[in-house]
Amino acid sequence: MDVFKQMSFKELMKVLGLGTVAFVLGVEWLNWLTRRLRDSRGPLKEVLFFPSPQVCVEHLFTSHRSFPCACPFPHGIQTSFSRLLEHLLSARTSLEMCIFSFSNMEMSRAILLLHKRGVVVRVVTDRDYMTITGSQIGALRKAGISVRHEMSSAVHMHHKFALVDGRKLISGSLNWTLTAVQSNKENVIITEEPELVRPFQQEFLKLWEASDPANLKLQSKNGQIKK
């Protein structure tokens, strides 16, 4: 402290300035090192297989909840389904989904939570399956989420993929249903590899535009939909 007392104001400001610069450079160096370490591992690549055992996932939705909660399911266990929910809930700006069948309540809860957080959610789904018993598409629409569906009754929108923040792809055989998650032999791949993400971005945008009612005309003579 005596050293600082003996310094002039100008000298003290110089020392403080150098300290600030050193701090900023240190933070930048740490950020650079973090990026290098991440880049050395390459883009995210993860594979999930189903069926997945039923465990408690409440902690993914409520950060302040005390555990164990009152539900009868095992706690503190990571499964393919909990990992899938974690990836979905990692969205910060956008979530784009092409989903054939969507009736899983926990996945619907995750999407609604993202919407509540301000994440822009867009959904393209199948014309027929969006109205089957248990479908969560109606709940998404009721919450104000933008949903479009395949216009033609002759084909199905059979994709099952999602894009998180435009950089993370979630894709596989898994329908977003309870049966698929808990009973079926299914697979999901999660990746941030740009060469794989980009084509799915293009496919989503193509289907989103093709499913826009404003771009379609209904031919009354034969009941077919024509652009």
UniProtKB/Swiss-Prot annotation:
<keyword id="KW-0744">Spermatogenesis</keyword>
<comment type="similarity">
    <text>Belongs to the phospholipase D family. MitoPLD/Zucchini subfamily.</text>
</comment>
<feature type="active site">
    <location>
        <position position="165"/>
    </location>
</feature>
<feature type="active site">
    <location>
        <position position="160"/>
    </location>
</feature>
<feature type="active site">
    <location>
        <position position="158"/>
    </location>
</feature>
<dbReference type="InterPro" id="IPR051406">
    <property type="entry name" value="PLD_domain"/>
</dbReference>
<dbReference type="GO" id="GO:0016042">
    <property type="term" value="P:lipid catabolic process"/>
</dbReference>
<dbReference type="GO" id="GO:0034587">
    <property type="term" value="P:piRNA processing"/>
</dbReference>
<dbReference type="GO" id="GO:0005739">
    <property type="term" value="C:mitochondrion"/>
</dbReference>
<keyword id="KW-0378">Hydrolase</keyword>
<dbReference type="GO" id="GO:0008053">
    <property type="term" value="P:mitochondrial fusion"/>
</dbReference>
<comment type="function">
    <text>Presents phospholipase and nuclease activities, depending on the different physiological conditions. Plays a key role in mitochondrial fusion and fission via its phospholipase activity. In its phospholipase role, it uses the mitochondrial lipid cardiolipin as substrate to generate phosphatidate (PA or 1,2-diacyl-sn-glycero-3-phosphate), a second messenger signaling lipid. Production of PA facilitates Mitofusin-mediated fusion, whereas the cleavage of PA by the Lipin family of phosphatases produces diacylgycerol (DAG) which promotes mitochondrial fission.</text>
</comment>
<keyword id="KW-0255">Endonuclease</keyword>
<dbReference type="InterPro" id="IPR025202">
    <property type="entry name" value="PLD-like_dom"/>
</dbReference>
<keyword id="KW-0812">Transmembrane</keyword>
<dbReference type="GO" id="GO:0042803">
    <property type="term" value="F:protein homodimerization activity"/>
</dbReference>
<dbReference type="Pfam" id="PF13091">
    <property type="entry name" value="PLDc_2"/>
</dbReference>
<keyword id="KW-0472">Membrane</keyword>
<feature type="topological domain" description="Mitochondrial intermembrane">
    <location>
        <begin position="1"/>
        <end position="14"/>
    </location>
</feature>
<keyword id="KW-1000">Mitochondrion outer membrane</keyword>
<keyword id="KW-0469">Meiosis</keyword>
<keyword id="KW-0443">Lipid metabolism</keyword>
<dbReference type="GO" id="GO:0051321">
    <property type="term" value="P:meiotic cell cycle"/>
</dbReference>
<keyword id="KW-0540">Nuclease</keyword>
<keyword id="KW-1133">Transmembrane helix</keyword>
<dbReference type="GO" id="GO:0016891">
    <property type="term" value="F:RNA endonuclease activity, producing 5'-phosphomonoesters"/>
</dbReference>
<keyword id="KW-0496">Mitochondrion</keyword>
<comment type="subunit">
    <text>Homodimer.</text>
</comment>
<feature type="domain" description="PLD phosphodiesterase">
    <location>
        <begin position="153"/>
        <end position="180"/>
    </location>
</feature>
<keyword id="KW-0479">Metal-binding</keyword>
<dbReference type="GO" id="GO:0046872">
    <property type="term" value="F:metal ion binding"/>
</dbReference>
<dbReference type="GO" id="GO:0005741">
    <property type="term" value="C:mitochondrial outer membrane"/>
</dbReference>
<protein>
    <recommendedName>
        <fullName>Mitochondrial cardiolipin hydrolase</fullName>
        <ecNumber>3.1.-.-</ecNumber>
        <ecNumber>3.1.4.-</ecNumber>
    </recommendedName>
</protein>
<keyword id="KW-0221">Differentiation</keyword>
<dbReference type="GO" id="GO:0007286">
    <property type="term" value="P:spermatid development"/>
</dbReference>
<dbReference type="GO" id="GO:0030719">
    <property type="term" value="P:P granule organization"/>
</dbReference>
<feature type="transmembrane region" description="Helical">
    <location>
        <begin position="15"/>
        <end position="33"/>
    </location>
</feature>
<dbReference type="GO" id="GO:0035755">
    <property type="term" value="F:cardiolipin hydrolase activity"/>
</dbReference>
<keyword id="KW-0442">Lipid degradation</keyword>
<feature type="topological domain" description="Cytoplasmic">
    <location>
        <begin position="34"/>
        <end position="227"/>
    </location>
</feature>
